[in-house]
């Protein structure tokens, strides 16, 4: 999995490219932890290049969101495809994640 990082003001946008599945979760988590150490605690995960997320991927997103929330930081999701949005609904996780149509809208939500 390739993960690109872009800073937009005080917000870090991470864009994974590929499915967020078990074998890539450690890489994704490591990249997030690295970014957490060098940020103001505002993150957007751009899911536009993620075709699907398995249970381990969901677990990783939940854990990161909860960790960030405990320290007053925040994570937003954007550009999830229909399949990912349906998985979030079926697992009743839509209330945990703020989701936006695109990265710019998600970044502006922090203002």
Residue map of PLM features:
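Short beta-strand/loop segment at the start of cytosolic alpha/beta domains
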Residues: 1-15
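Amphipathic alpha-helical interaction surfaces in cytosolic regulatory modules
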Residues: 20-97
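Short low-complexity stretches enriched in small and charged residues
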Residues: 1-4, 32-33, 107
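A charged, well-structured terminal subsegment
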Residues: 98-111
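Active-site donor-binding loop signature of nucleotide-sugar glycosyltransferases
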Residues: 16-18, 102
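Residues that form or immediately flank small-molecule/cofactor binding pockets and catalytic motifs
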Residues: 8-10, 82, 104
